[in-house]
Amino acid sequence: MKHTKKSHNGFTLIELIIVMVILGIMAAVAVPRYLDSISNAEEAAEDAVISSIRAGLTQYANNSLYSSGRAEWPTNPFDALSEKPAGYSTDATDADIDGEWTFSNSRITHQRADNSRFAWDYDEGTQGGGDDAKIGSLGPRTAIVQAQ
């Protein structure tokens, strides 16, 4: 009499648990890196817009100097751009929609997709040709703390 050995195909419970643990560890490492990459991408996009504004302000001041003899910056820094950034709004409040850029009360604001907001202080400077004239300034990025 010949005995045949039954073959059990499949995974044991231990093997399945080990796979789940490995997947959990991979997810714990990958998700924060993914979120960081999104934040870094949004920061890079903001930097590109602000660099564009700085270049536009320089061009605006040069054109003003050529035409009037005075280097002036516009009241609204977005007016120095030939093309406004995607999401630009003339809304008089701080940005409150994902991807929105606004300018009000001497402050440029941008809201990211994660609802965090950032601002850059803007000063157009003192206009005029006298000794009190000064060129404007565009400050660094600062986080806006939102009230809970």
Where are these regions (language model features)?
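Extracellular/periplasmic head regions of type IV pilus-like filament subunits
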Residues: 62-118
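Membrane-proximal N-terminal amphipathic helix
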Residues: 39-67
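N-terminal leader/signal peptides at the extreme start of proteins
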Residues: 1-11
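Short glycine/serine/threonine-biased micro-segments
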Residues: 8, 22-25, 54
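Short, surface-exposed interaction loops/tails
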Residues: 109-148
